[in-house]
Amino acid sequence: KYLLLINRHHIASDGWSRVILLKEITHYYNFLIGKSNDLGLANNSIQYRDYSYWQRHYISGILLENQLNFWKKHLAGYEQFLLPTDKIRPKNIDYSGDTISVKLSHQLSQNLRTLASDNNCSLYVVLLSGFYVLLSKYSNSIDLAVGTPIANRQFNQLAEVIGFFVNTLAVRVRLNISEPIE
């Protein structure tokens, strides 16, 4: 019995890449033990370094200026809100934290999916909307921005490339508190 351990830094590859890597290792292993006559690995015409080089040169000049102007306009007037805490903030922030896992009941999960379907949106949008309402209640603010990761693999050629493509998208909302919440 053998055990393969893989340690990767989150800046070297994203979650999408993890799936690609595991698929490639599985194909290669099956080839080695004779379960497959074909490696079945993607023959990528580009590597991550090619994408990185292209991106650095593509996003420059007038395109970069236009994108920066878009985000400056989109986030203009936004003021960071502070959430109330149950403990005093330390003078020296060490960024330590914890993970709290919550399991939704099958019924609640189904109700949320139905709500999404009835409103012609994704479950993600329903949950993000609830998060905005919660943040608004805690912060007493109706102008909110939340960063959310996006895959950033808009080109088909990147589908099987291992690398860190994730980008963070700032999603800003201004809640209308006169609207009822469903």
Which residue ranges define each predicted feature?
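Extended, hydrophobic beta-loop-alpha segments that form or line the acyl/peptidyl-thioester binding
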Residues: 15-26, 36, 124, 142-149, ...
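A generic secondary-structure signal for well-formed alpha-helical elements
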Residues: 15, 25-36, 59-62, 75, ...
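A short, structured beta-strand-centered segment in the mid-to-C-terminal lobe
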Residues: 60, 107, 136, 157-182
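Active-site-proximal acidic secondary-structure segment that organizes catalysis
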Residues: 1-47
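Recognition helices and adjacent regulatory flanks at domain boundaries
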Residues: 95-103, 108-111, 118-121, 126-130
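Hydrophobic "lid/gating" helix adjacent to the active-site nucleophile
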Residues: 83-84, 115-160, 174
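Short amphipathic alpha-helices and their capping loops
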Residues: 23, 27, 44-103, 107
